[in-house]
């Protein structure tokens, strides 16, 4: 059996651009792509913390160090500049692979620069 597990996420990125007439995708600062292991053209899920929208698209590169997180094409209709989003990618793996797998969790500041990374999420308490 194969399981779909969270491979990586960029937590609480700020949308810097929204380009309706650009070819569809999400442009992400290349430093963030490198830190997460998200590949260009890989499917990503976008969860808008600000408005609750959830959708998928694919990643393309933005200039390294720029802090750019730009939603393009139809995806631009789901967000506004300034929205806080989570960008996630999943991977399919066997149960044995899942037993030792650790996701790459990348946390960013208000300028979409890496503040810290982790491979676990704290247990949520009641």
Swiss-Prot record:
UniProt-listed InterPro entries: Asp_de-COase-like_dom_sf, Asp_decarbox
MF terms in GO: aspartate 1-decarboxylase activity
Recorded name of the encoding gene: panD
Function: Catalyzes the pyruvoyl-dependent decarboxylation of aspartate to produce beta-alanine.
Keywords (A to Z) from UniProt: Autocatalytic cleavage, Cytoplasm, Decarboxylase, Lyase, Pantothenate biosynthesis, Pyruvate, Schiff base, Zymogen
Protein name: Aspartate 1-decarboxylase
PANTHER family the record matches: ASPARTATE 1-DECARBOXYLASE
UniProt: substrate binding residues: 57, 73-75
Reactions performed catalytically: L-aspartate + H(+) = beta-alanine + CO2
Post-translational modification: Is synthesized initially as an inactive proenzyme, which is activated by self-cleavage at a specific serine bond to produce a beta-subunit with a hydroxyl group at its C-terminus and an alpha-subunit with a pyruvoyl group at its N-terminus.
Cellular-component GO terms for this entry: cytosol
Assembly mode: Heterooctamer of four alpha and four beta subunits.
Compartmental location: Cytoplasm
Cofactor note: Binds 1 pyruvoyl group covalently per subunit.
